[in-house]
C-alpha cells in the first residue's frame, strides 16, 4: 500500500512539474497585447500595457529558463522548435520592456553593441543572447533546417514578419509556420511584383538568410516559386514566378518599433 502511494505521489509530482508544451501562459499574454491589422499581415504590440502587466511574461520566461538540456533533448523535434521560437520572441519582448520607450530595437545598447548579442537571459543551462538562439541553435545546419522560422521569430520591428497573437506549439507547428509565412509573403508592402522593371521585390530577410532557402529548395527563386500566387493577382505574372523568369530584388527594411 505504501509503495502504491509513493508511486502515485511521484506520478502526481511529475505531472505537476511537466513543461506546458501548449505554452498557454504565453498565448494568453500575446492575445492580450498583440493586435493584427485589418489584412492580417502585420501586428503591433501594446508595450505600454505590457509594462503594466509584465509579471506573467517574467513568470513564463522563468519557466523556460528552468528547462535543462536533458529535458529539452527528450522532447520531439516539433516541441523543441516551438520552445525555441517562443523563447526568442518572449525574451525579445523582455529586452524591449527593459529599454522602453525606444524607437527601434537597434537603439538598445551602446554604439558598439549589437542588441542581439547582449547576454541577458538563461536558457538550456547557459547565459545566452538572442543571436545564439536563432543562429547557433535554430539555424544550425542539419538540426531543424526549417527556413520558415524566419517568419516566426520576431525582431520587434515593422519590417519583421508579424508576432502572432498566440504561442507556437508543437502539435500545430507546421500549420502555424505556414500561416505566418503566407501572411508575410502576401503583404505587398514587403513582398511584391514590380511590373515596371519585371522584378520580384522581396524583404531583405531573403538576402540576409538566402542560404537557408537555397538549402531547402535549391535556390531562392525555386523557394519563392512555391508561393507565386501570393505575389501578384495576375496569373501570367504568377506563372513567370513559378517558372523563375523574373529577377529578384530586395526592399529596404523598416526597423521602427512594432507598436
At which residue positions do the language-model features occur?
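N-terminal signal peptide c-region/cleavage motif recognized by signal peptidases
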Residues: 11-13
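Interaction/scaffold regions that mediate signaling and macromolecular assembly across diverse proteins
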Residues: 19-85, 89-259
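Sterically constrained small-residue positions within well-ordered secondary structures
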Residues: 7-9, 144
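Sec-dependent signal peptide recognition
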Residues: 1-7
Amino acid at each position: 500500500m505504501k509503495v502504491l502511494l509513493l508511486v502515485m505521489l511521484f506520478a502526481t509530482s511529475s505531472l505537476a512539474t511537466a513543461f506546458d508544451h501548449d505554452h498557454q501562459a504565453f498565448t494568453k499574454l500575446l492575445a492580450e497585447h498583440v493586435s493584427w491589422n485589418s489584412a492580417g499581415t502585420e501586428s503591433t504590440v501594446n508595450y505600454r500595457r505590457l509594462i503594466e502587466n509584465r509579471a506573467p511574461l517574467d513568470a513564463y520566461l522563468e519557466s523556460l529558463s528552468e528547462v535543462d538540456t536533458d529535458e529539452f533533448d527528450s522532447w520531439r523535434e516539433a516541441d523543441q522548435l516551438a520552445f525555441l521560437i517562443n523563447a526568442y520572441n518572449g525574451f525579445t519582448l523582455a529586452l524591449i520592456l527593459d529599454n522602453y520607450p525606444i524607437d527601434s530595437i537597434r537603439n538598445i545598447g551602446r554604439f558598439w553593441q549589437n542588441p542581439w548579442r547582449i547576454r541577458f537571459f538563461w536558457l538550456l543551462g547557459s547565459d545566452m543572447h538572442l543571436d545564439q538562439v536563432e543562429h547557433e541553435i535554430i539555424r544550425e545546419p542539419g538540426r531543424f533546417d526549417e527556413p520558415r522560422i524566419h517568419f516566426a521569430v520576431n525582431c520587434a520591428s515593422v519590417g519583421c514578419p508579424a508576432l502572432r497573437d498566440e504561442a507556437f506549439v508543437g502539435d500545430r507547428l507546421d500549420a502555424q509556420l505556414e500561416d505566418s509565412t503566407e501572411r508575410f509573403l502576401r503583404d505587398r508592402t514587403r513582398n511584391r511584383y514590380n511590373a515596371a522593371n519585371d522584378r520580384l521585390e522581396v524583404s531583405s530577410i531573403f538576402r540576409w538568410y538566402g542560404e537557408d532557402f537555397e538549402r531547402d529548395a535549391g535556390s531562392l527563386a525555386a523557394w519563392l516559386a512555391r508561393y507565386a500566387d501570393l505575389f501578384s493577382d495576375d496569373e501570367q505574372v504568377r506563372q513567370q514566378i513559378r517558372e523563375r523568369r523574373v529577377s529578384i530584388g530586395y526592399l529596404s527594411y523598416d526597423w521602427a518599433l512594432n507598436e
